[in-house]
């Protein structure tokens, strides 16, 4: 991503306004994850958001990234504030395009993950179940393997080994279907640990 950004940034003066926002968004991801310049990345995304209109899909995608950044830098006040706004806005989407559907699933997955990390097990299970149902309703496998993996992780401390193994096996099957052998092998390791 860094390499592609560097190639494209040379042409930034010829880009449309939306494409310039997109380039700034990519730069924020690179700064945050590659260079560790987290505060600068957050400030850049906040600036981008101030220049976009709220219902715009780019606004929601950038907000979703900022949502993740706030959690990662442990700014939980801003995290919860943006979560409420994003949850409302994502729920208003018509889900008539792949981009809208994927954004909805991605945001819901992120919420599920953070609920799990905060040990809010019951709410995490409800949200994961609802998001899996959404994937099935719209016949998409986007993040479905990740959702089943997350359900296995959420339930492994209290659910039966058989149930947890089923979640992991479903995730394993979906990762193999996607050709994601790295994750499939990791899941295979989890399954082996459960059966021992």
Locations of regions flagged by a protein language model:
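Residue signature of alpha-solenoid helical repeat architecture, marking inter-repeat boundaries
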Residues: 16-20, 57-60, 98-102, 142, ...
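Structural register within alpha-helical repeat arrays
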Residues: 27-29, 66, 111, 144, ...
